[in-house]
Each structure stands twice: as structure tokens, then as C-alpha cells.
Amino acid sequence: TLSSSSAASDVYKRQVDSVEDKPYTRRPAAPFTTSTLQQEAARKLRMSSRVSMQVAQRLYENGYITYMRTDSVNLSQEAVQAARRQATELYGADAVPAQPRVYAKRNETAQEAHEAIRPAGDSFRTPAQVKAELRPDEFRLYELIWKRTVASQMADAKGYTATLRLSATAQDGRLAQFSASGTVITFKGFLDAYEEGRDAEVDGENAEAKDRRLPQVAQGERLTGDPIEATGHETSPPARYTEASIVAELERREIGRPSTYAPTISTIMDRGYVSKRGTALVPSWTAFAVIGLLEDYFAKYVDYDFTARMEDDLDLSLIHISE
């Protein structure tokens, strides 16, 4: 390591001291549920939860996609075959695994009354085939759904995770040592079609480093690069929620249903409890006052587990009625 920025700027003669490789495999993401569609539309398309559901509603009503309020990641057999067939046609036979992929429930309370969100029909229309028929926002959301569905039936991406150890000699003769870790992809698989987004502010630098792509280098290889600059780092507080991350948190805590995620976010924004600063959701002073009041006088009803317990009680009631 370097102790000062002046020493850093003097470094030259960089070379690779060692390369440690470990096998890397990455599976495609499951087809869309309501919550994951809202999260991806927020990250990739900058659509709010309300807008993404309005656009999805139009696509569904006009016969372009299946029902958009669902907590299931399962596809019908016809949809699985359509996705595999289209992946083979577009990306080659190697892009599809020998057996169809089956995805497990995201959580135990998933009702799975409908299949996952996907292009409609037993033979998918490509984005290029429907572009002239759709409005720009409809086309972008359809393309996102189509890519995710096709990719969900494609082969794993494969490669290796490399840890590089580098050394360099400064002009004053001191030895500087560095290390870098990242992923080298040797077979793209589903990445040819689609790569799942992430909320960078929430996942942080560790997740970014895990999937950082490195060039292929060999031990002893001489390297060139930009001038080295030493920078300081400080611990940051937890990031504010975005629409994507708050939907994920609602689902994780089993608060609400797929049909209530977008209305819940819309309600707290319409009432002035939160506002948007960039993509972040920032609470107002009114929100703090309301939360304090509710916690003091209605603690039972604002407990995070209340909804899950109520759902369980309703399920038990239905069982007793059926008996």
C-alpha cells in the first residue's frame, strides 16, 4: 500500500505478481413478479411504481403481456417452450440448458394464483415486431419483460473470479503493492439477453466489486494505466430508500400484496409524507409526527409483523370454514 498521494504519483513499472482464479457461475433471474417488475422498471427505465403498473395494465388489456399482479415466478409449459425456442433462434443452441429451468417460490406466503409476468401467447413476439404498435413507454416495458422472460430459460453465465496482485516500483525505489478482484466472463449465456439491475446506493461497493469485469492477464505481464491517485474513504450512513428498494423491503417483510405496492407508495407521496430527491424517498417532518403518534397510540397496528399475522389468521379462518 501507499502512504501518501505524492508516493502514489511516482509509481511506474507495474506488473502482475500473481493471478488466483476460482470458478464463477451466475444463474439468470427468475421471471417477473409484480414487485420485481416495479423494481427493475424503476432502476432501468426510471419509471415510478405507479407509472410502471399503469403501463403494464395497458399492455395486459391490449393482449401483449399476461396479468401483471402476481407473486409467482412460474411459467406455463407453453411459455417455457416459447422462451427456449426464441433463445435458441437468437443466441444459438448453446445458450439454452438441456432441461427447462424451474424457479422456487420467492417466499412461503406467495399465493401464485397467476403465472409470472411474461409476453402473451405461446409464441412470443420480439420487441422489434411490436415496436410500431406501442407507445414509447409501453415498448420499453414490453422489451424489459421480454428480455427477462427469455433470459430466465437460458444457460448460466460462466467464467472465473480472479484476484490479481500487482506490484510497482516508485521513483524513489520503494515497492508498492496492490490487489484487485473481479469476474472474467468466458461464456455469457443469459447475459447475451439480459442482466438484472441493482440499486447501487443500497447494494454498495461490495456488490459492485463482486461483479466487476477484469481483463484477462497473466502472471509476469507488464501493465500500463492511468496515473495512480490515493483517495480517502469514509463510512457512509445507510442509503435512503428508493421506489425499487422500498418495494423489495415491503415484499421481504410480507407487508401488503402485489396489488398494493404501487398504491402504498403513491399514497404516502400524495399525502406529503415523503418526497423525491433524485431517486431517493425523503421523509417529511409530517411523516415523523404521524409515525410518533401511531407508535404511541396504535403500536399494534403499525408493527411490521401485523400484516403477516393478519394474513395467517385469515388463512386459518378459511381452513376452519372449509372444514
Which residues does each PLM region occupy?
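Basic, low-complexity terminal or inter-domain segments flanking catalytic cores
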Residues: Q15-V16, E20, S48-R50, M68-S322
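Eukaryotic nuclear/nucleolar intrinsically disordered, charge-dense low-complexity regions
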Residues: N62-I65
